[in-house]
């Protein structure tokens, strides 16, 4: 496992855990970003920009360090 802020552009991962302040966790959930979602990193320079459920999101690297993910390597892991 790794943290979201450690992924690079083009990486694909599954969200395992979101360990943030309650208000940030609520914002993630209300935006449709939940444990089990598959994400694709669009850019990891500055903010982390990623795609989840056909939507694009941007979060700070500071917030991204609280999101635990498993990097997916093979297509069949999706």
Protein language model regions, located:
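Short alpha-helix capping/helix-loop boundary micro-motifs
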Residues: 1, 23-27
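Short, surface-exposed secondary-structure edge patches
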Residues: 4, 28-32
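A structural micro-motif recognizing beta-strand termini
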Residues: 18-20, 53
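C-terminal structural segments of small proteins and small subunits
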Residues: 42, 47-78
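Conserved hydrophobic positions within beta-strands
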Residues: 15, 38-41
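Extreme N-terminal tail/first-helix region
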Residues: 1-7
């Amino acid at each position: 496992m790794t943290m979201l802020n450690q992924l690079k552009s083009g990486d694909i991962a599954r969200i395992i855990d979101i360990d943030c302040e309650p208000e940030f966790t609520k914002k993630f959930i209300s935006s449709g970003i939940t444990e089990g979602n598959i994400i694709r990193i669009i850019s990891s320079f500055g903010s982390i920009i990623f795609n989840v459920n056909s939507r694009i999101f941007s979060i700070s690297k500071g917030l991204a360090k609280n999101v635990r993910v498993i990097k997916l390597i093979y297509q069949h892991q999706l």
